[in-house]
Every structure is written in structure tokens, then in C-alpha cells.
Amino acid sequence: TLAQHHDKLDGKVQCVVTWAGAIGGSYMADNFYELIKNADTDLLTGRLHDFLQLLAPQITRKGSLRRLDEYDIKGAVHSLTTHARNEFYKQYHQLLDDLNIPIINITAATTALEVPTFQMADCLNLTRYDGNNDMQVTQEQAKFKIPMAAHAAMLHGHHWDISYPPFPRAIRMTSPNLDHPFPRKAAIIAIYQLLAELGLIN
């Protein structure tokens, strides 16, 4: 929708690549939202910077997270619920298709024995919907489903594995499968090569 609402981007967006997306929302987000929708999240918001500093210090260097009082944790989680994402799709799917911009979906799939211990239950729960889930979303939830979209690849890895560097050992809680060995750089290079072969980039 950004390309639709900003004239300066008209004709400049040649392609969109989704990477372990949650376009269709997540059943996990549905469950989590039910837990927090009536809770006081002010305390959690105040400690958000400290938590993210542990989780991803390279993106939370001093001053990188500002205006924490404006963060809306409940709203953020709600935006990932299947209901919210389905409403977005109903409202915008025709607009997105009419932009005539190719969308390439890259998804992931894993098994319960390949995810962090504390994510095994969620992975198994998602298996009821899709045996090829990535521990957080199903294949259908990870893809745009419009005529201008194509599913290019299903990677072998869990949702965090293909997205994040290794988690610091101090916060792994003795869990395995948080070293995230998926070759992200090689995958990104392959995507750029594909886009070049399709004539979408030089």
C-alpha cells in the first residue's frame, strides 16, 4: 500500500520479496493476544529496550529505540492476528494486485525437533493446520495470495533461524536450536540472482 499512497514511489518499486512473512497473521498471535488484551502492558513497554538489548544488541545500540511511551504492544500483537490480517486482505487485495508489481514469496518449514525447546508445543500445534509450518506461521499465512504473487521457495529452517543471527547464550535458557545456522547471505544472493534473471533489477 506504500507504493499506492506515495506518488514519489510510482514506477520505482519493481518487485516485492516476502521473507518468512506473516501476511495471513498467525494462530500464535491469536492465542497471545487473548492473553494480553486485558492486561496492563505499561510495565512491559518500559522494559522493552532492555529485553531487545539482550535479544538483538546489534539493532538496539544506544538511542536506537526512542519514544517508548508511544509503543502499542497490544495493537502490534493484534495486527498479527488472523482476523486483523484477513480484514486487511479483504480491503487491499485488489489494490495490491492492480499495482502490477510482482510479489515473490519465500517461506520456511521445520519440524518440532528442529525448533527451540520452548517453541515445540507451538510448532506441534501448528502441525494441525500445516505440517510444513515454520513454528510460527503456516505456508498459507506466510504468502500473498494474489495473481501477481508467486511462491518461489520453501526454505528448510524455523522462523527465527532464517531471520536472526544466533541468540546470545545468556538468554537461550539451555534450549538447543537457537544458533541459527541457516545460510542467510547465500539465500539473499540467490534471490538477487533470480531478480536479475527475471529482469527486475540490473
Predicted regions and their residues:
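Helical cap/lid subdomain of alpha/beta-hydrolase-fold lipid enzymes
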Residues: 7-202
